[in-house]
């Protein structure tokens, strides 16, 4: 079987400090769900994924990694601050493998929600047909498609369906499988799943990078959160986790959670590799400052990276078309801030970057619901202003201009500077022509 080539590339990183401030959008101590006529507290409900629809509604996933998680997918009510099962409580029924069993990753675009169902409940073996991608129409709340993954694509004993990005240009979904075994004595079997969304009458999916070294957890790496070791007896072993698709849909970035490495793949090469068994080059895109969970690419060619070891959020700016060099910037205000413990998933809405901080490393047994170690709240949604930036699904918009007075002034000054520069060039050129003419005249006089 033809394997992916792994190319090591030397990349220069520049750490810069950004003064971009962050703000608390909402924080809560215990997750509260709102059902038909009553509210209920859930101490085993940990928020993980977060996304926005076009109307600004907030959707949050609560994977059923523990008992009594009443709903695995919910809509956040910004007025009551309660979570409402979405699209309904019935669709969140974990006793039915056809319903939403355990959701972590999902994506929203153009009125459609793509929900990735892990199928794994409280560490048990997933039921038949429970590992799937479910597609809903937001407005009607109707399910429009269901893609059930067969064993050769997602092995129930190992599959841990984690993150998802949508390639709207090719109508494909890329899904990270962290490959965490049910039996922790076994080795991880992570990989990447490519799902064809065009085919609706049957599953059309391919698994690549199966147990490739770049998707495996780093066996020598022991994760620390705010300098505190995660798991005392054995290191946390999680393979490929966060994935991000570039705004031109040409490059897929990924990183194992138990690692500080960042990798990328050219999409066309990867698809050609699948079709003709040709070589596909994995690019080592750099050594990150710390381990990451969520990744997110933006319309302005920024790669946003969570830093779970310290609570930082990083921005990797692509400054070369061939992705051989990246420029890192850092939100200074997040450094060492315990309130951002374990930033999990990223989302962009209304020129703001949002993320959930959920203390995954402490959940659920070391969570203090009476006196949270992170302050007043155990869980938080933060945001930071990211002017002129948007979701990768909107496509690249590198030349986008915000026509505010300040930016107009900058562009006017820039245009004037260009005109002045060109005038000097023209003047210099004219002078040079005069000198040449004079020299030619002198030569003519000497000859005659």
What are these regions (language model features)?
Residues 25-40, 82-98, 144-156, 202-233, ...:
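Surface-exposed loop and turn segments in beta-propeller and other repeat-based domains
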Residues 29-71:
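Beta-strand-rich domains and repeat architectures in extracellular enzymes and scaffolds
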Residues 41-54, 94-111, 116, 151-176, ...:
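Beta-rich, blade/repeat-based domains predominating
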Residues 60-66, 115-119, 124, 174-184, ...:
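Conserved beta-strand positions in repeat-built beta-propeller and related beta-rich domains
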Residues 72-78, 129-140, 188-198, 370-389:
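Beta-propeller blade signature
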Residues 139, 196-203, 265-275, 316-324, ...:
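Short loop/turn segments immediately following beta-strands, especially the blade-tip
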Residues 345-403:
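Blade-level signature of beta-propeller repeat domains, shared across WD40, Kelch, NHL, RCC1
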Residues 399-414:
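Extracellular juxtamembrane-to-transmembrane boundary of type I single-pass membrane glycoproteins
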